[in-house]
Amino acid sequence: MVGGEYKIMRYVIIGGGPAGATAALEIRQFDVKGEITLISNENYQFYKRSKIINLVSASCSEEDLFLKGRKLYEENNITFIKNHVEKVIPEKQHILLKNGATIQYDYLLIASGGSPIILPWKGVNLEGIHTLYNLDDAKKVAEKVCNAERVVIVGGGAIAMKAIKNFKKIGLEITIIEKSSHLWPIGFDRKVSRIVEKKIKEKGIHIYLEEEVVEFKGENKKLSSVVLKSGHEISTDIAVITIGMKPNIDFLVDSGVKIEKGIFVDSHMRTNIPNIYAAGDVAQIYDPLYNMPILHPTWGNAKKQGKIAAKNMTGSNVQYGGTIPIQSIKIFGFEAIAVGITHSKKNYDEISWVSFEKELCRKFILKDDYLVGALILGKKINKEMLKPTLKMAIFEKTNVNHSKHLLLEENIDFDKIFLNNIIV
């Protein structure tokens, strides 16, 4: 309160993804008079990023991506600015934009998301080489595939799994190149991947494992082939790069904000600088499941962190208690769910049940008899039941010391094993 009147607070949010958009709307719920400014390097309001690949096969329209409409910010009195942030200057409490403008803040949330990793391959700037991170990327790919017959996907992770399904729908010849020994390395192990690889190959899709791109070749500045480390050359019209993401934090160099892989934040989503918060793909925060500060680049976690940051920026005292990462893919009749830690390591135990004949897999990761992760793959799995059950079992510390044998049963009763053994 200043001179008997409440000061109107200035909230500035960098990034319009799930963390930034959620935070903006949450701030408005708690502060109806505050000035909220959201800055994004995209010319779109909040949209469902995980569905953009469906534009390629026309499985959805562009309008379907805008879950809350295209006037979300106007309807909530949020100022939207399309621009790039060049610098954050904490001592002056303002940010500098690419166009030279400065914006003052009382509270700043950095939710700048990530960018696709692109290596310095020879020929990487040829026409026909794309990424699939944002809406503009997807629109460009959707336009190019109309006159294409072949596509090479560099990387075999979750985005690649979604992409091949859509490229197959429109009849493209597809080749996947993956550096690891198996597909979706973050979720699958070699045994599980074999089941999916078999089905993908049956669809006429080519897979190159333990391979790397060394060069893109072209004619008249247009992509014509991809050269691998082995010397093999693959003719193609389009290449899509899906080898990973990196947090957008370069603009914070020399700002004083503590960064490493991401932006270090405490359990309130606060950085080391007063009144500056971070959330989403850029936030590096201690997680009890991993017992170390980590990045959690998932949609659900970004929304959760954005909401917590917003509440604390408006005077609440809410803490982030960690999250259980959940990822899922669906491809050619298979569904897979990866929850928590899905790869065993030192001092961890693994219990797995794999049937190549029935094309079914279950893997559980235990630490001192407590469930810390699970991977489920099959043709008919109830993911709407499994996701919350497994997430709760991990979060609430389920001890399975007396029910390990049940994990190997074909007709497993997840509720019986996990929900009845939660430590409270």
Over which residues does each language-model region extend?
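FAD-binding core/adjacent interface of flavoenzyme oxidoreductases
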Residues: 2-12, 68-152, 227-233, 240-242, ...
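Beta1-alpha1 glycine-rich phosphate/pyrophosphate-binding loop at the start
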Residues: 8-78, 164-187, 385
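Mid-to-C-terminal Rossmann-like scaffold of FAD/NAD(P)H-dependent oxidoreductases
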Residues: 8-9, 16, 29, 282-384, ...
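Residue-level detector of alpha-helix initiation sites
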Residues: 13, 17-18, 43, 114-116, ...
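Cofactor-binding loop segments of dinucleotide-utilizing enzymes, especially the Rossmann-like FAD-
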Residues: 16, 39-41, 134, 156, ...
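A Rossmann-like FAD-binding core segment of flavoenzymes
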Residues: 33-35, 76-97, 103, 170-267
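FAD-site-proximal beta/loop scaffold in flavoenzymes
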Residues: 125-146, 220-227, 232-308
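Cysteine/selenocysteine-centered motifs that mediate thiol-based redox chemistry or coordinate metal-sulfur cofactors
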Residues: 397-424
